């Protein structure tokens, strides 16, 4: 919305951007491809291009087995992800309110007109808006406005499997690759 000229405020609970992608050890950026066709472009691709330019991502790498979810993944450096995200939002004119969470919402018959944030220090700020996008990750704003929700999938209430990514230094990569080749039954490819 900021890129299109609308006054835009991003409310972020952490002191940095990226959500689970930078606050945890979440796996790679999800696929931009369906089979061999790239189906996600626009701002996400601009972000990926900037990450590659900053030496913060591998870019799109073809997967050995997409498990039905897409044929590419993009690994990334969490700190460069934070930097590129902030730089792009600044360019788009987006204001960012860090260390703040949603305290309450102004909602009448599912019409959302505003919300109040609370900062880490306890300060409360109220915002009115024509459009509010719930990007909390858990639908916090929608739930506070009375929307129905379910935990996990609606039938078995199962969650997505967790993913983890980590970095290591001083690894004997030749030895690791040799082990993988000699012990393929220990890995899913």
Please place each PLM-identified region on the residue numbering.
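Hydrophobic or amphipathic alpha-helical targeting/insertion segments
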Residues: 4, 8-19, 129-151, 155-157
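Rossmann-like dinucleotide-binding core of oxidoreductases
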Residues: 141-189
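Conserved N-terminal/central alpha/beta ligand/cofactor-binding core
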Residues: 6-7, 12-104, 160
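Core beta-strand elements of the Rossmann-like FAD/NAD(P) dinucleotide-binding domain
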Residues: 121-131
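Aromatic pocket-lining residues of Rossmann-like dinucleotide-binding sites
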Residues: 1
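Solvent-exposed loop/turn segments at secondary-structure junctions
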Residues: 15-17, 103-104, 122, 139-140, ...
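Short, solvent-exposed loop/turn segments at the edges of secondary structure
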Residues: 110, 136, 159-163
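Short, hydrophobic/aromatic-rich segments at coil-to-beta transitions
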Residues: 109-115
């Amino acid at each position: 919305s900021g890129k299109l000229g609308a006054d835009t405020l991003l409310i972020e609970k952490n002191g940095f951007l990226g959500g689970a992608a930078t606050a945890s050890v979440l796996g790679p950026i999800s696929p931009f491809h369906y089979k061999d066709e790239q189906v996600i472009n626009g701002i996400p691709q601009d972000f990926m291009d900037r990450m590659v330019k900053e030496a913060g991502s591998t870019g799109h790498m073809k997967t050995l087995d997409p498990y039905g979810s897409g044929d590419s993944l993009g690994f990334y450096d969490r700190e460069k992800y934070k930097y590129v995200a902030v730089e792009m939002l600044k360019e788009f004119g987006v204001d960012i309110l860090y260390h703040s969470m949603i305290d309450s919402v102004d909602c009448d018959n599912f019409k959302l007109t505003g919300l109040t944030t609370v900062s880490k220090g306890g300060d409360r700020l109220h915002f009115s808006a024509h459009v509010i996008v719930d990007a909390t990750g858990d639908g916090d704003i929608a739930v506070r406005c009375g929307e129905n929700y379910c935990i996990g999938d609606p039938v078995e209430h199962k969650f997505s499997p967790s993913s983890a990514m980590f970095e290591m230094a001083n690894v004997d990569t030749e030895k690791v690759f040799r082990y993988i080749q000699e012990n393929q039954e220990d890995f899913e490819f």
